Amino acid sequence: MSDPVLNIQNLHKSFGALKASDGISLDVRAGEIHALIGPNGAGKSTLIAQIAGGLRPDSGSVHFMGRDVTRLGTVLRARLGLGRTFQISALAMEYSVLQNVLLGALGARGRVFAMFKPAVRDAGLREVAFNALEQVGLQDHAAMRTAELSHGQRRQLEVAVALTLKPKVFLMDEPMAGLGAGGSKRLTGFLDSLRSEAPILLVEHDMDAVFALADRISVLVYGQIIATGTVENIRSDPAVRRAYLGEEGTA
């Protein structure tokens, strides 16, 4: 088996008496979707923030592509290929679809926002941006204001922005949030197609999507991973059913 693309070992993070991460270890392997599930307040978003570099763990390590990145910040990790999408959209709603992707391409090259206007005319950056939009199926919406996109299209746009970083792994924090059944089904198909681009660590409450997509699932409860396994393993695990899935998880 090849080495993990992303390897988290024994992460601890506390806020006062609250242990948000209590010895968390997990990995993400090439070509897979590894889902992270758990009840509200389990520490999922805190864990993603530590992996992305927005929070520094109290102890433990984050290795990415064989490199210890525990002490690196968000920007450096992104440039190495950690592509994050957000639970709450970080897109610039008044900008066009293309402009949002150009901003991502600028950041990927370490160029500052003040260079945005000349970047709009940069043929190389525009090619990168249009290629990313084509990959997510938004090329025909390039000139549209981002605020006019549907919720699902905004999620696709977030992925396009992440693609400009040439990601080695995607960190996705509740991409299905706010979607109806139809939108969730469409986005599930889209995410399934992304695994050939880069593996995905997927934080998600939509269990239909998780069970359809995940190669492996880790269950986080009160800052601890209580189980990791295949969909079948997790569905049948008594501790997981008691802590999170309930009886519907066996249906």
What are these model-derived regions, one by one?
Residues S2-A251:
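Glycine-rich phosphate-binding loops of nucleotide-dependent enzymes
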